[in-house]
Amino acid sequence: MKHLTEMVRQHKEGKTNGIYAVCSAHPLVLEAAIRYASANQTPLLIEATSNQVDQFGGYTGMTPADFRGFVCQLADSLNFPQDALILGGDHLGPNRWQNLPAAQAMANADDLIKSYVAAGFKKIHLDCSMSCQDDPIPLTDDIVAERAARLAKVAEETCREHFGAADLEYVIGTEVPVPGGAHETLSELAVTTPDAARATLEAHRHAFEKQGLSAIWPRIIALVVQPGVEFDHTNVIDYQPVKATALSQMVENYETLIFEAHSTDYQTPQSLRQLVIDHFAILKVGPALTFALREALFSLAAIEEELVPAKACSGLRQVLENVMLDRPEYWQSHYHGDGNARRLARGYSYSDRVRYYWPDSQIDDAFAHLVRNLADSPIPLPLISQYLPLQYVKVRSGELQPTPRELIINHIQDILAQYHTACEGQ
């Protein structure tokens, strides 16, 4: 895990560098990220969340060992060195089991941590901020920290048992946006106060001491805070550096610590760069990448309709809509308004709840059909110009092949490029 430790060390020395974390399990997003990191010769941090991947399979159907195998196999197929790959676990704690009593939820969380660490995940975000069935709302800093320390102890023991030494790096912090974007419409967002950040750190330090874990404190590399960035279905709250000045200055007093910013999706390139300069040096991105995937697929579906007789079309968009209506559990509680508003949200929302549906076999078949239809003969350049204008420029200059897969990958990489530039440092 020298990559992360070295990044933090350089940042603390004033290099204004950072690293972005790709939070997606979609094969095309991961291929885009691996190929981009390979081309730029940078390490790549890929994270699975406790919703996506857990000991029972999560919503992707993958355990941590499955996810690691899947990512490593993809990396090998693309000749990306595994020692440049960093795997992280995000929101690890009782998140999935909030409807259970705390004792039961935390027992599951213990097993969750064991499964991630045993599978070789090295960056561990301990998040015990959520109240369980029999807990007060909200939890106190002390309870949150005690639970995180308990999980850290499990993680350390598991790491030593499986790898002979404990080399994990931890992220702590409880003041995170709702995973995957806000449910409600936003207008203003409270930035974490320096006092709240200090209180979280001190509560965790004390809890770790009580568990006999003082020695691992230097491996706690980041604190999750809210720098004032978020998105809902149609709006983005942009980073305002002046509102985060006190918070940014506060972390300068901690020798081995930086901030981690969640929900940085859809921030402008300028905001992403400023976040890193202001010590929010780990930038999480997920929905913006699957949003770009969806944009590219909708564009290719529109091109297909121009080129292919209706009866031979994949009907990707209609298949997607039908599946989302048949299985509304991933969007129903998020999207509100009349029928038309919900239809638009299903297709176009920044929160990109459609990402939960790509693994569906019907949708996957339609996607394969779309790619086959467009791979049979070259896509006319004017249609690429019409529907994927940024890719058109690269096709015309000879740096991009106009095949369906390459157009999709490149469109996703346009987002990754913004994060790469933000994290490069000086």
UniProtKB/Swiss-Prot annotation:
This is D-tagatose-1,6-bisphosphate aldolase subunit KbaZ. Pathway: Carbohydrate metabolism; D-tagatose 6-phosphate degradation; D-glyceraldehyde 3-phosphate and glycerone phosphate from D-tagatose 6-phosphate: step 2/2. Belongs to the GatZ/KbaZ family. KbaZ subfamily. Forms a complex with KbaY. It comes from the Bacteria. GO terms for cellular component: plasma membrane. Component of the tagatose-1,6-bisphosphate aldolase KbaYZ that is required for full activity and stability of the Y subunit. Could have a chaperone-like function for the proper and stable folding of KbaY. When expressed alone, KbaZ does not show any aldolase activity. Disulfide bonds: none annotated. Pfam families: GatZ_KbaZ-like. InterPro entries: Aldolase_TIM, GatZ/KbaZ-like, GatZ_KbaZ_carbometab, TagBP_ald_KbaZ. It comes from Escherichia coli (strain SMS-3-5 / SECEC). The gene is kbaZ. Transmembrane segments: none annotated. One of its GO terms (biological process) is carbohydrate metabolic process. Gene3D superfamilies: Aldolase class I, putative tagatose 6-phosphate kinase domain like.
